[in-house]
Amino acid sequence: MADKFDANDETRTVYAVVYDNDQPVSTGQFLAETKIEARLTRIVTLADYCGCGYGAKVTEALETYTRREGFYQLTIHSELTAQTFYENLGYQTYGPKCLEDGEYCQSLAKTILKWEKNMDIAMLIAIVGGLLGCYLYLTKNN
């Protein structure tokens, strides 16, 4: 599993890991993208342990962390072979499929916290600001 780590690992990553005795058999990473959105990445289970539910447990543990920390949405950029796995966990596809490193990939998202009446105005401003930033980025790059 050592090859599943990257530059983000040393600074801002939260992990969930499933062990079989002392061996890590499934893991995943949480990365905060904005104050309201986060990304799950590098969710992997060793081949001998696939089908045991460990990938789902890792994903659910990271979702629990996401909820507790107050994030509203999670995104995942997944190879097509794992798309159904994430859809079964409540993720929905968005955007076009793309080819990366010889593999077709798809972005998926899941709302973790719903907007509630008592949420403060600062959060509303953060959401509107994020949407405006996305609009400006898309306008500039299209």
UniProtKB/Swiss-Prot annotation:
Transmembrane feature ranges: none
Entry keywords, A to Z: Acyltransferase, Transferase
PROSITE patterns with a match to the protein in the record: GNAT
InterPro entries tied to this protein: Acyl_CoA_acyltransferase, GNAT_dom
Span of domain N-acetyltransferase: 1-120
One Gene Ontology MF term: acyltransferase activity, transferring groups other than amino-acyl groups
SUPFAM superfamilies given in the database record: Acyl-CoA N-acyltransferases (Nat)
Enzyme Commission number(s) from the entry: 2.3.1.-
Glycoprotein found in the keyword field: no
Family membership: Belongs to the acetyltransferase family.
Protein name: Uncharacterized acetyltransferase SpyM3_1195
Organism: Streptococcus pyogenes serotype M3 (strain ATCC BAA-595 / MGAS315)
